[in-house]
């Protein structure tokens, strides 16, 4: 069975660029690199149907012959609209229709074996909170959270989350460290 890898990260690359004082091209280049790395290992890539870094990673993954892209999307636009998600669904090898946005955001961290955090945003913080609660209530999903320091504002996760899940966090300094880590998993 292939390793399932979920990606969580910002949808607004322009805002991320402003907050981190790094050019948008830095994040786009890193997304390309991560997608290329993930395409070299036998894994399923899980993302939400939205723009941003996760989608850019997924595009690079597919461009480099990644085996299976699973895209989650909400069946109902509640409590937030979903029309903007439609254009991303066509890239999927497998579509997972979730009941609503909660289940879409939750299952991108709960169904994969490993979750990779590629930057912070308000949406990413909610997904990190779901990981924290899964860990607190011994759901053991995901089994490992990878956080890439060069993509995080302060090179770490928020301490309110980090302190609760430190046993499952692996920090990697750069995206190039990801390939070595995944080959050892």
Map each language-model feature to its residues.
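Acidic/glycine-enriched connector segments
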Residues: 13-15, 22, 28-39, 47-157
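Accessory alpha-helical/coil subdomains and C-terminal extensions
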Residues: 143-144, 153-170, 178-181
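Short active-site oxyanion
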Residues: 42-45, 167-168
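Nucleotide donor/acceptor-binding cores
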Residues: 2-5, 43, 143
């Amino acid at each position: 069975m292939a390793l399932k890898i979920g990606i969580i990260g910002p949808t607004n690359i322009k805002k991320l660029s402003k907050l981190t004082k790094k050019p948008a091209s830095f994040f786009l280049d890193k997304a390309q690199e991560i997608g290329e790395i993930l395409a070299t290992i036998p894994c399923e890539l899980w993302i939400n149907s939205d723009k941003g870094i996760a989608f850019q990673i997924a595009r690079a993954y597919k461009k480099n012959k990644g085996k299976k892209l699973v895209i989650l999307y909400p069946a109902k636009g509640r409590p937030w609209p979903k029309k903007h998600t439609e254009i991303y669904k066509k890239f999927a090898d497998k579509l997972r229709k979730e009941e609503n946005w909660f289940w879409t955001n939750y299952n991108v961290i709960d169904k994969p074996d490993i979750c990779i955090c590629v930057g912070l945003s308000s949406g990413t913080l909610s997904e990190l909170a779901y990981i924290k609660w899964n860990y607190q209530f011994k759901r053991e999903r995901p089994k490992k959270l990878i956080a890439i320091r060069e993509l995080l504002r302060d090179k770490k996760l928020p301490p309110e989350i980090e302190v609760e899940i430190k046993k499952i966090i692996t920090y990697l300094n750069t995206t190039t460290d990801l390939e070595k880590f995944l080959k050892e998993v």
